[in-house]
Amino acid sequence: MHFVINDTVKQLLNLLWFCKKVNIPFEVYGFTNDSPSEWRNPDPDGRGGLEEIQVMKENEIYCHPTFRLLNFVSSDSGKDFEEQCQHLFKLSYSLQNGYSDYVPYGFNLSGTPLNETIIALRELIPDFFKKHQVSKLNTVLLTDGESQSISRVNMCPSYYDPNVMQFGRISLHSRCQLRDRKIGRVYHACNEWNWKNSITQTLLQNLEDNFPNCNIIGIRLLQSGEVSRFHYQYKEDENYTDQDKKSWSKTKSAILKPTGYSVLYGIASSRLNESEEFEVKENATKAQIRSAFKKNLKNKSSNKKVLSSFVDM
């Protein structure tokens, strides 16, 4: 991700500017599990280490205490909006160009805790609906890869005293099921190696069932050679056709609709640095801004289909 993080943020800031101009509320979060090693593990006496971020209950999904969601930019920032955007841009520039001395403690790139993020959205989405009084919400999940694995809570003997039982964690397997007592549903698929039966797909499906007025939009950054695997993994028919190849060669983007996502966009990471400025009048209406934004997209050799589709949702 660090090869394209700054280019990705440039695209993000363009989208935020559009939303800001037409008064579309938004929140921008970055997920991370980066933390210094001395924060992670307690000593034999139990001192130090990170506190659990959940009430531990056997057989519930386990979210590691290093997981964090960082709220970088908000539509409610007011006069701080531009400063927040500048901080985000400088951070991404430092990460992409290897200026580690300018990256704050705990803000380096890490794994991909997408599963934990989907779980956290169960609280963020209703809060957003309540705060902004909107009837529909687009939730965008942007990654450069699949989610890292997630565990469940179990009881196990203490490392220091085998006679003492304590909470631990163990990997999910194909016999695990996800039960949502609130809506009365049981999901049978928790296999990590196949999208149709993956825990990520299961969590997304559960999110969609809980919030039917929320579009779950995935954006996946693809490096050279990944597009065929992207199609095989996420297309329901598991078929990468000649038409798919031709479309990718022309637009360097793909639009799929796998179970769990309202829509999933694949974008060539090599094309993210394309940037063209567009201008509108200071007193332009929302319709004029929207028209100028979409007209600008037509001048781009790639990603225009993706961004145009997103604007129309």
Predicted regions span which residues?
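Acidic, glycine-rich A-domain
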Residues: 1-313
